[in-house]
Design a protein with these regions (language model features):
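Residue patterns forming the tRNA-binding/recognition surfaces of aminoacyl-tRNA synthetases
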Residues: 2-27, 32-33, 37-41, 45, ...
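Conserved oxyanion/phosphate-binding beta-strand-loop segments in alpha/beta enzyme cores
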Residues: 2-11, 15-70, 100-109, 133-139, ...
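Amphipathic alpha-helical
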Residues: 282-316, 357-410, 573-606, 888-917
Length: 990
């Protein structure tokens, strides 16, 4: 912090006279007083319609519309909060307080997302149980948030590690595990596709209504328990998969796709990640792909977040096509998905992922006349495939699909049969085909795809063009033949016809059709021939749901001696974490791709091996030693706020309908959900997508009545700050940096311990040594000044720079308000009960109207600017009228509640203003005599103010300087030219 900043920070505390001046010490006393009153009186208790939380301390639910506002709850880090963290919390609090004053029953609470890797890593280092560390961190964070004056209903607070909460997380997993997705069923919203209990699928198998996959012709009762479990596993929404996963030896755990960077490294720790085929829990989120996209239209979210989810889900329309593959073990089926079935006539080879099951059927010898460069230098296909698989395992997914990388691959010795033409297509394996994307197999059309073209050129494979440019394009296929593929969806189909004698079905000709027409026609042909059909695919992969870690929710699953999974009954929940001798998963050399996961829970053998009676006598079972990912607890926490004391229900129906049901208030709409959810855009894909998925499953199963969890989403910006480095590039404490004179270019200079320091602008963080904590602000200014400054820095959705020297301006506003009501010398109230003059009446009512609009639109910064104008006007009066200052106090109270409560009390009110009526403007005085004043700096417009036509030039100058204080960097301008009431031109100091 520079000397200027230090002096500015000290300024509010330098003067202790007069006795009743509003300063940091007085503010602290007022704030602690009112926080205790709020706690003691249950001021912010939200009233439920029934149950233990029905008491609203005189403000009960009957006849009052509900409003549910919440924040993305924090992870309780040992670092605590810095001033950048509370921006969203303060915004939600301002909105909550405003809606309370509108007469609404407001639910505003805070929980803690307490499972997570940092606490586990600390436990590994110290041997201290992560619960101890986490609960200490929660206590500190709860203290910091309480000191901020946030209007939480503290009866509803919880942490995701609480056994009572873990119970319901495991209960939800159980419901998802015990469900399947019936694409033919109608869900409660009326659209196709619905999760149903797995028992309904069993009924279909038992009745013969549905064939049993892999056991056609057999009765369900004839299958063994293990066989039945395997069949159902392929349908369950939570299922055990053995498929390629992201194995990170350096962390000792498997990662979800979303936890791997674009460089193929772990998001945490930057360790290498390898593709391995391991047994893991997954969730069938892909079943909900279409609904997750479609229902975005029903919710009020930022368009950029909706776009991010649409792109992540990646819905595409195409066809599923079946190719016969001739193997030594008989003809096998190879299913591919393509968005361009019209190009089937141009397919000249096929490619499967190195992990594809067909590679278990390669021949012992190379087919006759196999080109040498197809063999990769290996004597047999078996040797070639084995070596290629090992090489592929060592590559990251990013490396494998890199368009610029060299195309590798080799012939498998197998041939696939084109289902339309009957042509034999050599089947290659190549690592650019991923098993977890599509079906792990592709039909290659080198005439229409650059990657296929490059592969065909490398291996001497034929190229057939099946689309030519549109005549009106001016392009010609001759420009591409023998040189490049023609990659376009706009074109005319050629070389694409077959007669019935050669085809599996009727004759087919696509020649002369445009691509879209050809796709429709070939899809119909594929379905009629029984070799394919039009279908939808998604970029989204199923959610990898297990971790080889300790600090997470255990799975409510045990395994029999034969490995068959069994769901534990609800009455045995929660399954709590046992003590273990070592909290860390076994980690390996970060480059050891062949290592295998060893979870910490496996070390407590007494916990793992249990004797249970699950309905057929006591038997030995083995607990699952994986834990759920940290996303599990955050998927549903919003619902637990409705009543965390309820031990009988995850959420009781009447409470859900009142707080979150469709049309529960005027803005909820048919989607229902939380009325306002504020948090960072960085959660757009992971947390928000996972929460929507879980919610939709619970919606389908009848446990909740809204389609969506969050009706309105708002992403706050980031508070940024300057950081400083020495000449070695090492960060130095910002608080110890001294600002010096400007250099020859007019730029400020900085020193640290007498040495030159470099300034950079960006994030605030511990590693950058530029953290300022809320505790610093409370001590030097008070919580209300801190709240006022953060809410007034700029639009909530935009990032903005923190500048401690400008906090003083916020405190001065509160000091002026205080002086308008309280005599600083005597402490007596100094307002009058006289009538308002016309000018004050107009300004007051216009301010009420304008501030109401700004509060509805979540623009507290512009609301503050308008309140400053009104307060400045009252300061100019000989006597401050009660009729004007009381509405001012009410309007400011959501932003600076403590000082407003104190002034409200001193003005003779005995009830908290938290539930006072929001002021209403007298329309007779609204919209009159207002002009827009433009504030310029160096000729550029930097602010606009709505002011009275007869505003005093000095008052306009004061307003203008306050409006652009951040841009002036706390320095006095060199010159200010005021042309009231329309222009203020500022020349900044050099």
């Amino acid at each position: 912090m520079s000397d200027t900043e230090k002096s500015a920070q000290a300024q509010p505390n330098e003067s202790v006279e007069p006795s009743f001046r509003y300063n940091a010490k007085l503010a602290q006393g007022i704030e602690e007083k009112w926080q205790k009153i709020w706690d003691d009186e249950g001021t912010f208790w939200a009233a439920n319609v029934n149950g233990d939380l029905k008491d609203g301390k005189g403000h009960n639910a009957e006849g009052r519309p509900s409003y549910f506002a919440m924040d993305m709850f924090p992870y309780p880090s040992g670092k605590g909060l810095h001033v950048g963290h509370p921006l969203g919390y303060l915004a939600t609090d301002v909105v909550s307080r405003y809606h309370r004053m509108k007469g609404e029953n407001v639910l505003h609470a805070m929980g803690y997302d307490a499972f997570g890797l940092p606490a586990e890593q600390y436990a590994v280092q110290t041997g201290q149980h992560p619960r101890i560390t986490t609960e200490q961190n929660i206590a500190n964070m709860r203290r910091q948030l309480h000191r901020m004056g946030l209007s939480f209903d503290n009866r509803r607070s919880f942490a995701t590690i609480d056994p009572g909460y873990v119970r319901w997380t495991q209960w939800i997993f159980s419901r998802i595990y015990d469900a399947w997705y019936d694409e033919d069923a109608t869900n409660p919203s009326g659209s196709r596709g619905c999760a149903r209990p797995i028992s309904t699928l069993v009924e279909q198998f038992e009745s013969g209504k549905r064939a049993i996959p892999g056991f056609e012709g057999k009765a369900w009762a004839d299958l063994s328990e293990a066989e039945q479990a395997d069949v159902l596993n392929d349908f369950r929404l939570a299922y055990i998969s053995k498929s390629p996963v992201n194995w990170c030896p350096g962390l000792g755990t498997v990662l979800a796709n979303e936890e791997v960077t674009a460089e193929g490294k772990s998001e945490r720790g930057n360790f290498s990640v390898f593709q391995r085929e391991l047994r893991q829990w997954s969730m069938r989120i892909t079943a909900y792909g279409h609904r997750l996209i479609e229902d975005l239209d029903t919710i009020d979210w930022p368009e950029k977040v909706k776009l991010m989810q649409r792109n992540w889900i990646g819905e595409s329309h195409g066809a599923s096509v079946h190719f016969d593959v001739e193997t030594p073990n008989g003809v096998k089926d190879m299913e591919i998905y393509t968005t361009r079935p019209d190009t089937l006539f141009g397919t000249t080879f096929a490619v499967v992922s190195p992990e594809h099951h067909l590679l278990e059927n390669v021949p012992a010898e190379w087919p006759a006349e196999t080109p040498e460069d197809w063999k990769g230098g290996y004597a047999t296909p078996v040797e070639a495939v084995k070596a290629y698989r090992l090489a592929a395992e060592a590559k990251t997914a990013k490396d494998r699909v890199d368009e610029a990388g060299e195309k590798t691959g080799l012939f498998t010795g197998l041939y696939a049969i084109n289902p339309i033409t009957g042509a034999k297509l050599p089947l290659f394996t190549a690592d650019y085909v991923l098993m977890d994307y599509g079906t792990g197999a592709i039909m290659a059309v080198p005439g229409g795809d650059q990657r296929d073209y490059d592969f065909a050129v490398k291996f001497g494979l034929p190229v057939i063009y099946t689309v030519k440019p549109l005549p009106e394009s001016g392009d010609d296929l001759a420009n591409y033949e023998g040189k490049a593929p023609f990659v376009s969806h706009d074109g005319i189909v050629i070389n694409s016809s077959i007669d019935a004698t050669k085809a599996k079905g009727d004759s087919l000709s696509l020649d002369g059709l445009r691509v879209d027409e050809a796709i429709d026609k070939v899809n119909a042909w594929l379905e009629s021939a029984g070799v394919g059909k039009g279908t939808v695919s998604y970029r989204l992969r199923d959610w990898l749901f297990s971790r080889q870690r300790y600090w997470g929710e255990p799975f409510p699953i045990v395994y029999g001696e034969d490995g068959t999974p069994h769901l534990l009954p609800d009455e045995q929940l929660p399954i709590n974490l046992p003590d273990v001798p070592d909290y860390s998963p076994k980690t390996f050399d970060p480059e050891d791709a062949e290592s295998n996961p060893e979870a910490p829970l496996s070390r407590n053998e007494d916990w793992v091996k249990v004797e249970l009676d699950l309905g057929d006598g006591k038997k030995t079972y083995y607990r699952d030693t994986n834990t759920m990912p940290n996303w599990a607890g955050s998927c549903w926490y919003y619902m637990r706020y409705l009543d965390p004391t309820d031990t009988k229900h995850m959420v009781e129906k009447d409470e859900f309908d009142y707080w979150m049901g469709p049309d529960h208030n005027k803005t909820a709409g048919k989607s229902g959900g939380v009325d306002l959810y504020i948090g960072g855009v960085e959660h757009a894909v992971l947390h928000l997508l996972y929460s929507r998925f879980w919610h939709k499953v619970l919606f389908d199963l009848g446990y909740v009545d809204s389609m969506e969890p969050f009706h309105k989403l708002f992403n706050q910006g980031m508070i940024q700050a300057y950081a400083y480095t020495d000449d070695r590039g090492q960060y130095v404490p910002a608080a110890e940096v001294v600002e010096g004179p400007a250099d020859a270019n007019g730029e400020p200079t900085f020193t640290w311990n007498g040495q030159h320091a470099n300034r950079e602008f960006g994030k605030m963080g511990k590693s950058l040594k530029n953290i300022i904590t809320p505790d610093d602000m409370y001590e030097n200014y008070g919580a209300d000044t801190f709240r006022l400054y953060e809410m007034g820095m700029g639009p909530l959705a935009e990032s903005r720079p923190w500048n401690t020297r400008n906090v003083v301006g916020s405190m001065r506003f509160l000091q002026r308000l205080w002086r308008n009501v309280i005599d600083e010398t005597t402490g007596e109230v100094r307002v009058t009960d006289g009538e308002l003059d016309t000018k004050t009446l107009k300004l007051l009512n216009n301010t009420i109207a304008d501030v109401t609009v700004e509060m509805e639109a979540m623009r507290p910064n512009t609301a503050i600017a308008k309140l400053i104008v009104l307060n400045n006007h009252l300061t100019s009066l000989d006597a401050v009228p009660r009729a004007a200052v009381e509405p001012l106090i009410l309007m400011l109270s959501p932003i600076a509640p403590h000082i407003c409560e104190e002034l409200w009390s001193k003005l003779g009110h005995t009830e908290s203003l938290a539930h006072a009526d929001w002021p209403k403007a007298d329309e007779r005085y609204v919209g009159q005599d207002s002009v827009t004043a433009v504030v310029q700096i160096k000729g550029k417009v930097r602010a606009k103010l709505e002011v009275s036509p007869d505003i005093d030039p000095k008052e306009l100058e004061k307003m203008a300087l306050e409006a652009v204080a951040d841009r002036l960097g706390g320095k006095e301008p060199r010159k200010v030219i005021v042309k009231a009431p329309k222009i203020v031109s500022i020349v900044p100091a050099e």
